[in-house]
Amino acid sequence: MTTLAKPPRKLSREVRREQLIEATISVLAVRGYARATLTEVADTAGLSHGLVNFHFTSKDILFSETLAYLSEEYTQNWQRAVALAGPSPAAQLDALVRADFLAEVSTPQRLAAWCAFWGEAQSRPLYQEKCGSKNAIYIETLEQICAALLAEG
């Protein structure tokens, strides 16, 4: 497993949290959900186990926040793509589909982390809650674009 570059000692709380979330994504990609440990996350981030516990009081909280981070990243990605596509429904649909394949959100590590979470979603309703509202927004946007395409004939 790759260890991230050794970070400076003093970083903001948000930067440290993001660093730990990125390390969690890396660990999930290699080890999977059940075999990922906080120690591996700390090692991958180049931080102490204590810092992981300081920022995330449990593995469940760290994983939940990692899923929320991935979900927000994905949502911002497709929303930006649709907004940049302009007013044409055909261009918006094209942008929406292409957004799923952009390197920022479809790296092997990120896809593996998503798969790890999908495998746990049935037994962890919290994960469904974390992504459910964002998924509903995606579906609503897709339906609106398709309705606009149909209206154009």
Regions found by a protein language model. Give the residues of each.
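N-terminal intrinsically disordered/low-complexity leader segments
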Residues: 1-15
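Amphipathic alpha-helical linker/stalk segments
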Residues: 8, 66-96
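Helix-turn-helix
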Residues: 19, 23-65
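Solvent-exposed, amphipathic alpha-helical segments
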Residues: 19, 23-30, 77-81, 113, ...
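Amphipathic alpha-helical segments that line or abut small-molecule/effector binding pockets
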Residues: 22, 68, 90-108, 112-116, ...
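Short coil/turn segments at alpha/beta junctions that flank glycine-rich nucleotide-binding fingerprints
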Residues: 30-34, 85, 107, 152
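Short helix-capping/turn signature of helix-turn-helix
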Residues: 56, 116-123
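Amphipathic alpha-helical packing segments from all-alpha helical-bundle domains
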Residues: 72-75, 80, 106-115, 125-152
